[in-house]
Amino acid sequence: MGKTVVITSGKGGVGKTTVTANVGTALSMIGKRVLLIDTDTGLRNLDMIMGIEDKALYNVIDVTEKTCNLDGAAVQSARFPNLYILPASQTRDKEELNEEKFKELCDEAKKRFDYVLIDCPAGIEYGFHCALYPADEAVIVTVPDKAAMRDADRVAGIIETQFKNVKEIRLCINRLIPELSDSGLTAGSAEALFTVAVKLIGIVPEDPNILIDAYNSELSVNNRRSLAGRAFKNIACRLDGIDIKLLKLNKRRLFKKRYR
């Protein structure tokens, strides 16, 4: 039996979908069968990041409403055969994704996949609650600014009090710039952990390769030059129970290296 992990944030624009795509791909690269589910109804992006937007004929609501089954809707990655993507609907209303039926879908998927990763909508409204309803674990993504960290803390509190099905909550600090955090110009990992107060699963450094890779329809976990890609791989390993130390972030390497 696999497990369902929701990737959430509270604040939008923190890189939640990028984390979902890269961590899911990294899990598939170590031999795990992975299903990525986009629940951001009306604003789906996971299919585009994964390069399957032209192949996505059905969506998660089609499966919950029995228009088609999971086999017919989930798109297998051409490059990573253990990885499947189930897109969100671009045209339906968020409330049309019924949480009980969505849980049934996730419970069935766990029988066939090692990991079901749910890309959760931003905010704490209906879509958030629906995505959390079937989850076994949660990863909260934040960036080192006060608004994002406050929202992440709020999300952690809601999960702890309202979703007893979620047995573990962990924090992913995304887009950290060591040069700025060490100078006190932005928050660092210690301040983020103090604010959110959940276990850390990983720190992803700011990395120009993410933009370059996305523009070329690539994933950073498949780019050997990408420090962020290495961080995503490490997060995947920790999610799978492997103890790996945090990356040592070399400021000179991050900010003076030329990217070709």
Outline where the language-model segments fall.
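Walker A/P-loop NTP-binding active-site region of P-loop NTPases
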Residues: 4-69, 115
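Charged helix-capping and loop-helix junction motifs
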Residues: 99-103, 183-190
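Conserved C-terminal guanine-recognition region of P-loop GTPase G domains, centered on the G4
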Residues: 149-164
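P-loop/Walker-type NTP enzyme "switch/lid" segment
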Residues: 39-111, 212-216
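G-domain G4 guanine-recognition motif of GTPases
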Residues: 10, 143-144, 169-182, 203-210
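Inter-motif core of Ras-like GTPase G domains
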Residues: 111, 125-146
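NTP-binding/hydrolysis catalytic cores, primarily Walker-type P-loop NTPases
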Residues: 216-260
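Beta-strand-loop-alpha "switch" segments that mediate conformational coupling across diverse proteins
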Residues: 177, 192-220, 232
